[in-house]
From Swiss-Prot:
Its EC number is 3.5.2.3. It catalyses: (S)-dihydroorotate + H2O = N-carbamoyl-L-aspartate + H(+). Zn(2+) 2 binds at residues 154, 181, 234. It is an enzyme of class 3 (hydrolase). GO terms for biological process: 'de novo' UMP biosynthetic process; purine nucleobase catabolic process. The keyword Metal-binding applies. This is Dihydroorotase.
Amino acid sequence: MKILLKGGRVIDPAQNLDGQMDLLLENGKIAAIAEAVGSVPEDTRLLDLKGMILLPGLVDMHTHLREPGYEYKETIRSGSEAAAVGGFTSIACMPNTLPVNDNRTVTEYILKRAKECDTVHVYPVAAVSRNSEGKILAEFGDLKEAGAIAFSDDGKPVMNSILMRRALEYASSLDRIIISHCEDLNLSAGGLMNEGKISTELGLPGIPTLAEDVMVARDLLLAEFSGAALHIAHVSSAGAVRMIRDAKKRGVRVTAETTPHYFTLTDEAVTNFNTNTKVSPPLRSREDLQAVREGLRDGTLDAIVTDHAPHALTDKEVEFEYAANGISGLETALALSLTLVDDGLLTLSELVRKMSVNPAKILNIPKGTLRPGADADITVLNPGKTWVVDPSNWRSQGKNTPFFGWTLKGKVIMTLVQGRIVYQED
């Protein structure tokens, strides 16, 4: 199959490209990229994309696909289809499944199911510890051999400091990273939302930013001591941003991510007890939100991820205390992130770097570019299209979103994976 994508604005930060160009796709690869591709074979399919923006396929390095074990929340198929709708061509799925992805059998199952679904690239993240209990290290070497791209107990922190040190050193020896969920469970115990004025007014137990900051500080010190690569997940606090910034200046091998809800929402969103605003870490204060936005602007935060955490209605339509944590984010992440461009915080090229180039680089996967010879993984964006968030139309089984009814600007109209159109807007 040969496809000529003609007349669109191509943005590829990996090549410092931003301009109107043609892309020729052949045998699943980028065959040519030029201001005007010359003669093409007769059997080439022509797609006129004038007015559209073509990006290297987005890479989400923090997704929860729920399968195996929680298929009532999401499946690898529904999650992959949601990713394609959102413009993501590669996703890294977290290990908090049932059973936990702490052994090669589960890793191989995920890869097998992803291959059967044949939608987007799926990269399994395996657990740091057996059953993510934080007691005994998982078999990193065996998991890497099976296809694990990184290690994380995400959803839970590794509270044991010596275990975390060993995990960093073990992963480093295998050229893999640890993705750390930074939370001191002793400080967050019993909390339901961010500790502050709003939690006091609502009468809900609070989780202080200190619960995040203490573990960020510990993990940065462990990474500095060991020389290993550390990636800090879903950064939400001003203290965490500040410490990561300082650590980078000292040469610590640390990268960090945040999600759209931490730069678009504050704890004020919880005031009507909407359980779709319950997330871990919790939505923080206005000051924390501003610090996260500044961290994105100055490069302290390397990546924007979805932390896509789909849940069934029964997990959310309960009292706030009993509701599950998480937001379903694959189908809204890009449009929410485009608000950073509209606000002048990032250029479009800088945003693409944080949603494609950098995540691919951090995970060490061959994605995030439209260079000739690369896989033809492409996100086609209509930058001017406005749309209303309505989860009843989503491909994801998880309809849990605090953004219901929001009008957003910028819509993915087509997603290609290895030259195949895996999503096209009706």
